[in-house]
Amino acid sequence: NKKNDLLAHMIKDEEWDQVLVFSRTKHGCEKIADHLNAAGIKTGTIHGDKTQGARTKALREFKGKIFQVLVATDVAARGIDISNLPFVVNFDMPTYPNDYIHRIGRTGRAGQEGSAISFMSSDEHKFLRGIEGLLKIKIDQTSHESFKPNEKPSTAGRGKPRSRGPRGGKPSFSRNKRSSD
């Protein structure tokens, strides 16, 4: 998965010390965490299949910087407060535009600056349009300049090339800076 590779690359290359990553599904949370842990990035998860005790422990370990990354679903992350959280990543674009606001609201709290970054595959553009409509702004999109995905698109099903996203197959993301001015 190119998004997994890009996430691991950005965490390491840009030296992100504490990152909250949002996934649309519980299964997605575990897959992302498995990939990051295999890449040597200490990662925990919180989602609906975890007991309250396990979610509390994972959150405590993330706040205590035992985990560098915490991967969460929207529902499991509602109401959590992490002071001085520098990075939020929308690994999957949220289905509902209001969830985007809740997600990026986890960073840039109490006068601190923070960055929210959204990864987007070609089939998620409809979610971006919904967010832009709600916020009444155009969110900038870019490809990560030092991440080089495979140039040749893979084929699936009937031999047709599968899209890897905009800009010639490079995964795209958007970055929002937040500060409490």
Where are the regions a protein language model picked out?
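Conserved helicase RecA-like core
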Residues: 1-151
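Intrinsically disordered, Lys/Arg-rich low-complexity segments
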Residues: 150-181
